[in-house]
Regions:
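Alpha-helical cap/lid subdomain in secreted, periplasmic
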Residues: 5, 32-38, 56-189
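Serine-esterase "nucleophile elbow" of acetyl-processing enzymes
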Residues: 2-51, 58-67
Length: 189
């Protein structure tokens, strides 16, 4: 892989799906991805239980301390699980994108899917938030990284929400080309 000569920093602003929930941090996908992106720095800003509002509150300090070249936004799952308004999610994610871009960082936005028990109208409105924001200038939209994992009980913890340790290498495999794309400063095809 040909990376830019400049080492870059990517901040992952996420929730428990990125925070190694239910396992040691060393076994999580972020840590597994680090050696594959040698010379670059992955900063975990993932906190279990985080909502888009919580991520927005924490973001200025994370941008100041990490000074990232790119921000991977992986928030919304807890907003959906709590039945928060898609309009509120959109407002928070828009501010996260704006703050990240104002700091000079490129933005990679991960789609998030909500459980089907919330009904098709809520799920559609929720998905539309990501589609709309992913179309903004300077934002790369990444498909939901749990697709293919969440339906496999062998890859999920007993709660049916969080990926287990066996899923972490698969998530790292999924993430790697997206991170490379961001590091090469071009949208992924």
């Amino acid at each position: 892989m040909a990376f830019p000569l400049k080492a870059e920093t990517i901040l992952i602003l996420g929730d428990s799906l990125s925070a190694s929930y239910g396992m040691e941090e060393k076994d999580g996908w972020i840590n597994l991805l680090r050696p594959r992106l040698e010379g670059h720095t992955l900063v975990s800003g993932a906190v279990s239980g985080e909502t888009s509002a919580g991520g927005l509150r924490r973001l200025p300090a994370l941008l100041e301390s990490a000074k990232p070249d790119a921000v991977l936004v992986m928030l919304g799952g807890n907003d959906g699980l709590r039945g928060f308004s898609p309009a509120e999610l959109k407002k928070n994610l828009t501010k996260i994108i704006d703050l990240s871009q104002a700091s000079g960082a490129r933005v990679l936005l991960s789609e998030v899917m909500v459980p089907t028990n919330y009904g098709p109208r809520y799920a559609k409105a929720f998905a539309e938030v990501y589609a709309e924001l992913g179309a903004l200038p300077g934002v790369t939209l990444m498909p939901f990284f749990m697709t293919g994992i969440i339906t496999d009980p062998q890859l999920m913890q007993r709660d049916g929400i969080h990926p287990n340790e066996a899923a972490q290498p698969k998530i790292a495999d999924f993430m790697q080309p997206w991170f490379v794309s961001v590091l090469e400063n071009r949208p992924k095809a």
